[in-house]
Swiss-Prot record:
Keywords, in A-Z order: Hydrolase, Manganese
Top-rank taxon, per record: Bacteria
MF annotations from Gene Ontology: adenine deaminase activity
Subunit annotation: Homodimer.
Signal sequence, start to end: none
Identification of the protein by name: Adenine deaminase
A biological process term (GO) from this entry: adenine catabolic process
EC numbers, comma separated: 3.5.4.2
Catalyzed reactions per annotation: adenine + H2O + H(+) = hypoxanthine + NH4(+)
CDD domains, alphabetized: AdeC
Family the UniProt entry places it in: Belongs to the metallo-dependent hydrolases superfamily. Adenine deaminase family.
Length: 588
């Protein structure tokens, strides 16, 4: 928990204080009063009856003593339950393929009033210019969009080619920005544990802020050392005992339920009345189709209540107050005097049915957000421009030679998990002994002219066709999987032609593709249009076989070397447990 930075975010002038106190005392007129409402008590459990009184951006008072208080406007909640605005503790907005402006339009009406985002996807492609754009978007957003300064660009030095660096000097230039809450996920955990000075310099520079972690499956002395370095949280836990041990050692636990990594069922049993202040909810990576059809943090709260019997006040606590306290955002997370008036009115608290949202004391209208979207996006000056410095490819670029009787390494996918297993398969004249093995390749897209790095993939479920994408964590090179070199080349050439994007090929033809013109990561289409296009892509992909629920998001993590066990980067096959490159052929 980091309270040392609260002064940075809770800006309120003396004049605002005097106006707020006057309304609290009953000596002045409120801007809004919400009547006919019950407030969920996140501290004690139960409910508080009575109005919510708002002056400016802040709550002036709560309770029956304000029943007859005067207001410029009154909001009839019709018996709704009021809870604090939801907070996502860790996400990459780019992974939604929406701009920050469009993301706000899609998620704010669902009660997501605050996000803590790490824009390291666009920073890996465009460097500091990408971070600066996110900051501009955050400055003009109604949603509270806070930024963690990306710490590992690239994710792991010397393991991949990416588009830009983000030096400590550049990072420090953003440290005191009003939207910055700390240092984003420190993914090079072996480097931290071994005491690499370059990494410790980053931790020292941001130690007065919040230091985000990333340590999937870590335990023992290594976990102790990582926490001893000052790391405060982790969103990568996927096993119950792993999460429990991290909590025991004082680390805060971000329980993640994204579109590919789905850890809520495994970790939800940990949440209780005692440790809930140390537990938070996050999505990390969630696509627009799921946001439109299932929700965002609201979907996670709903599952905690309905599937895991988490008490109401505890479920909403981990979705708001716990995260606010952890990041030192003490003006957020509670419906109490002096707190920012980020309020979600629920017609059904158990089903998380959002009736109305207020942020910074103002009611939110979804149609107004949509109407403002184009102008706000233009005002933010998005970093347009082709970031694909790659010539078209041919089938021969993906040719691999195999020797009968030899054994070859296979990246083995676990559906709906980011980790993979490292298996092997023997090749014969009839092919591999495993019939689920297909091909995977990663092509750098930043003008280095490297030959494609090629490998084998099992368990993905691809029976025919090919999928290609420029969303490929964290360097965002071109990743392609396929059953034939010809279709792989066709898919890759389509995303090159689009200036970045996603593509499905089957029967020798492009079945569906989605251009992503901003950094090869984001679309400028509306959330609804983007969700429809994702739906078409998924439908086309399902014709290729029994793929993961979110095939493109799952595929995007097959090149991320900081998550075990076997991955493929633009420079070759990488052992994510030994943190070293390895060979396709098994020789030992």
């Amino acid at each position: 928990m980091n309270n040392s930075i609260n002064h940075k975010f809770h800006h309120i002038s003396r004049a605002e204080y005097q106006e707020l106190l006057a309304v609290s005392r009953g000596d002045a007129v409120a801007d809004y009063i919400i009547d006919n409402v019950s407030i969920l008590d996140l501290i004690n459990g139960g409910e508080i009856s009575g109005p919510i009184v708002i002056k400016g951006r802040y709550i002036a008072g709560v309770g029956a003593e304000y029943t007859d208080a005067p207001a410029l406007q009154r909001i009839d909640a019709h018996g709704a339950t009021a809870v604090p605005g939801f907070i996502d503790a860790h996400l990459h907005i780019e992974s939604s393929m929406m701009t920050p402006v469009t993301f706000e339009t899609a998620t704010l009406p669902r009660g997501l009033t605050t996000v803590i985002c790490d824009p390291h996807e666009i920073v890996n492609v465009m460097g500091e210019a990408g971070f600066a754009w996110f900051a501009r978007c955050a400055e003009q957003a109604r949603q509270n969009q806070y930024l963690q300064v990306s710490s590992c660009v690239p994710a792991l030095e010397g393991c991949d080619v990416n588009g830009a660096s983000f030096t400590l000097e550049q990072m420090l230039a953003w440290r005191d920005h009003p939207q910055v809450t700390g240092l984003a996920e420190m993914m090079d955990y072996p480097g931290v544990i071994s005491g690499q000075n370059a990494l410790l310099d980053k931790l020292d520079a941001f130690r007065h802020l919040t230091l985000d972690g990333h340590c999937p499956g870590l335990g023992g002395k290594e976990l102790n050392a990582y926490i001893a370095a000052g790391i405060e949280n982790c969103h990568e836990s996927y096993q119950l005992e792993e999460g429990r041990r991290k909590l025991q050692l004082g680390m805060s636990l971000m329980i993640r339920e994204g579109s590919a990594a789905r850890n809520l069922n495994a970790l939800a049993p940990l949440i209780n009345e005692f440790n809930s202040p140390q537990c938070m909810l996050c999505t990390d990576d969630r696509n627009p189709w799921e946001i439109a059809h299932e929700g965002h943090i609201d979907a996670l709260i709903r599952r905690l209540i309905e599937q895991h019997n988490v008490p109401l006040h505890v479920a909403y606590r981990v979705a708001s107050w716990s995260t606010a306290r952890h990041f030192g955002l003490n003006h957020l997370g509670l419906l109490a005097p002096g707190k920012q008036a980020d309020i979600v009115l629920l017609s059904d608290a158990r089903k998380v049915t959002v009736q109305q949202v207020l942020v910074k004391g103002e009611p939110i209208d979804a149609q107004t957000l949509q109407a403002e979207e184009s102008a706000k996006l233009a005002q933010s000056a998005p970093p347009y421009g082709n970031t694909i410095a790659r010539q078209p490819v041919s089938a021969s670029d993906f040719a691999l030679q195999f020797t009968p009787g030899k054994r070859y390494r296979v990246i083995d996918v676990i559906h709906n998990e980011l980790i993979t297993h490292s298996h092997s398969s023997v090749y014969s004249e009839n092919g591999f002994e495993r019939n689920d093995v297909c091909f995977i390749a990663v092509l750098e897209r930043y003008g280095q002219r490297l030959a494609p790095a090629c490998g084998l993939l099992g368990g993905f479920g691809l029976n025919e066709g090919a999928l290609a994408a420029t969303v490929s964590h964290d360097s965002h090179n071109i990743v392609v999987i396929g059953r034939s070199a010809e279709e792989m080349a066709l898919a890759v050439n389509q995303v090159i032609q689009d200036g970045g994007g996603l593509c499905v090929v089957r029967n020798g033809q492009v079945q569906s593709h989605l251009p992503l013109p901003i950094a090869g990561l984001m679309s400028t289409d509306t959330a609804q249009s983007l969700a429809e296009q994702i739906d078409a892509l998924k439908a086309a992909a399902r014709e290729c076989g029994p793929l993961p629920d979110e095939p493109f998001i799952q595929m995007a993590f097959l090149s991320l070397p900081v998550i075990p066990a076997l991955k493929l980067t633009s420079q070759g096959l990488f052992d994510g447990e030994k943190f070293a490159f390895t060979t396709l052929e098994v020789t030992e």
